[in-house]
Amino acid sequence: MDLKYLNQKEAIAVDQELFNEYKFSVDQLMELAGLSCAHAVAKCFPAEKHPRILVCCGPGNNGGDGLVAARHLALMGYTPTIYYPKPTAKPLFENLSHQCQQMDICDVKECPSVESAARDYDLILDALFGFSFKPPVRADFVAVVELMQQTKLPIASVDIPSGWDVEKGKLTECDVEPALLISLTAPKLCARQFRGEHHYLGGRFVPPALQRKYELNLPVYPGNELCVKL
């Protein structure tokens, strides 16, 4: 059977079942999701060639995944720098930020220009918006979305390329075009429009009964891998 691509309503329902029926906590799933993102990045963009990563984090859970990924990427030998224009004032996100600070992961307060990003980084990790995003992009994030639209650096997007509609995908021809898309839990409908080189599935935590209920038809993760190529 074919892999299922989730619409927005289904993606929210799966998440809610993980929280309510299976009693996963947000921080538990965020840690597993962010770790799988770091592993997918490492498979596609080895630290030897792409050591400097600009990690762009949004205000919600997608941004939290980015903070987790930054911490694990640092442990894998990368040099991540975090751009977090609108930090979330909740203990979970404050703790994730604190962990990055304690690991001497730098952050920048201003969005880099296209020129400075090309000079200072080898890759951008796009962890701005998740499947709850609805256009238009808010003012706090316009500059970083424009950076990702204009840069020649490779981009790795977490779950949804920033600015894309979760179901319709790209809304304009100048939308973000990632080289790597890391779908989490299950791919969303917008992933059908993805034309980049690498598409991975991460978040190896979906209980078999939940997979059957939603007919997700997820691929088998090889061995002890935390992500699988789609």
UniProtKB/Swiss-Prot annotation:
SUPFAM superfamilies: YjeF N-terminal domain-like. GO terms for cellular component: mitochondrion. It comes from the Eukaryota. Its EC number is 5.1.99.6. InterPro entries: YjeF_N_dom, YjeF_N_dom_sf, YJEFN_prot_NAXE-like. K(+) binds at N62, D126, S162. Binds 1 potassium ion per subunit. Transmembrane segments: none annotated. Its cofactor is K(+). GO terms for molecular function: metal ion binding; NAD(P)HX epimerase activity; nucleotide binding. The keyword Metal-binding applies. Residues 11-218 form the YjeF N-terminal domain. (6S)-NADPHX binds at N61, N62, G63, G64, D65, G130, F131, S132, F133, K134, P135, P136, D159. It catalyses: (6R)-NADHX = (6S)-NADHX; (6R)-NADPHX = (6S)-NADPHX. The keyword Transmembrane helix does not apply. Keywords: Isomerase, Metal-binding, NAD, NADP, Nucleotide-binding, Potassium. Belongs to the NnrE/AIBP family. Catalyzes the epimerization of the S- and R-forms of NAD(P)HX, a damaged form of NAD(P)H that is a result of enzymatic or heat-dependent hydration. This is a prerequisite for the S-specific NAD(P)H-hydrate dehydratase to allow the repair of both epimers of NAD(P)HX. This is NAD(P)H-hydrate epimerase. The lineage of its organism: Eukaryota, Metazoa, Ecdysozoa, Arthropoda, Hexapoda.
